[in-house]
Each structure stands twice: as C-alpha cells, then as structure tokens.
Amino acid sequence: VKLLVDGFTTKITRADQELRVLVYPSAIDLSSDHLRHLAGRLAARRREIGTRWRRITPGRQALLVLAHLRCGDTYAQLAAGFGIGVATVYRYVREAIEVLATLAPSLAQVMRTASRLAFVILDGTLLPIDRIAADTRYYSGKHKRHGMNVQVLTDPFGRLLWASPALPGSTHDLTAARTHGIIEALAAAELKCWADKAYQGAGCPVRVPFRGRRLKRWQRRHNSTHAKIRCLGEQAMATLKGWRLLRKLRCSTNRITDVVKAVLVLHHATA
C-alpha cells in the first residue's frame, strides 16, 4: 500500500504501519436510516449463508460501505480506519453492493408505479471512469471524456425513480434508451415523457424541444416552458453525483451497473 505522508509517497510495511498511518474521525452526510437499512440487509445475508464469525459486525460493515459509496474512500483508507485488511474491505464492499443491487426495481415495476403520474422526465448522464485514451468505446464525444452512459427516469418533481444499466460512454442517449426498452415501456404504459434534443426521433411518448435557429415565437415559448420542466430532472443527476464514488469510478466497468443500482436502492430506502 502506498500512502502520501508529509508530501512523500511511502511504501507501508506491516512493521511500521501503525507509525505512519494516521486515522481521524469523520462524518458522512447520510441519515441513520441508511445505516440501519443496510445493516439489516447485511445481517440477513449473513444468516442466509450461515456466517458464524467475521471481523466486524453488520453495522460496522454497513458503515464501511457507506463511507466508500458516499465519500469515495479507497480500500486502503477504509482498511486503516476499520483495522482490517484491504482484501477484506474489498470483499465486504462487493458483498454489500451485490445485496443491494438485487433489490433495485426493474423498469416494468417503475412503469407500474409511474402510471399514476402526469409525466416523467428522461435524461442521460455520463459517469466518469478511469480509462486510457485507447479505449475509444468508452469515450463520449459529447462530454469529451471516458465514462459510462446511464439513463435516468424521474417524477415531475425531479425525484429519482429508476436508473438504467450502464453502457459504454460512446453510446448515444437515444440508442441507450432504445437498448433498455425505455421508449417501448413508455408507449405501452401510455405515459408522457419529457426529454432533451438528444432524444429526437424517439416517437410519440417522448416530447422534445424544437430544433433550429429560426424558430417561430410560439416554438421559442414552447422550448422555454419545456426547459423549465426538464431542468427538474437535473435534481436526480445531483442525487446520483452526491455519491462521490460515482464522480470518478475506478472499478471494473462490469461492476458499475451494480454500483448504480446499490445507490438507487439506498436512495429509495429513505426517500
């Protein structure tokens, strides 16, 4: 493990680890409901698989996982803070994410819930990832960076309803929406949807603003009203990015979908 101590990168050995690693108390901007919800799920998981003993309790494991997801703390930092090994931290985090991901609602379930709403808002976001320039599949020309494309549905007040599986960043928003079956699900539910210009050509259920520079007055007024409604969907993006791990993901791209689902479940647990 390499840590930055007094401006120098130092390799930590077992013999001098206690002398060089500093641990301090900190806070997580989450409610105790998040902690109780996750701890309860982890305790149930341990009973299910017949776990007899572990280094830390379900409550401490839940706290560790929340620190990782919400604050973006690394495995090495968490290992030092909780007095366990880095490999153990990795296993605990992965287990918790898998447990939460299985609880995430499907698109069909969300459509049934949203059928009572006047409309929903659809938008796409790019979750930045740690990739080299050669990985063109993950490079978004729109955002000029590498990342994963995630589609988000919100209610009319901007509350997060659903987040899609993650696709490579080069995927266009409309292509992603069609890949996930969002357009077909909206049409089947006869649910109105507001979206930006990236979804031009999506069809009847999706309402988009007019394109072009020489628009008539009524078209400009329509676009202005459309933007005021659509901007509420940005609150959902802020909700996702409030979990600092999603601001720069360094894990395998195959695990990002489960991470997003885990965040969604934690958000719904206390919403």
Model regions: which residues?
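A short, structure-level motif marking secondary-structure boundaries and short turns
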Residues: 50, 59-61, 221-222
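Charged, often Cys/His-bearing segments associated with DNA-binding zinc-finger transcription factors
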Residues: 1-53, 201
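Ser/Thr-centered flexible coil motifs
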Residues: 31, 57, 216-218
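Short, amphipathic alpha-helical "recognition" segments used to contact nucleic acids or chromatin
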Residues: 57-71
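Short, solvent-exposed segments of well-ordered alpha helices
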Residues: 55-58, 143
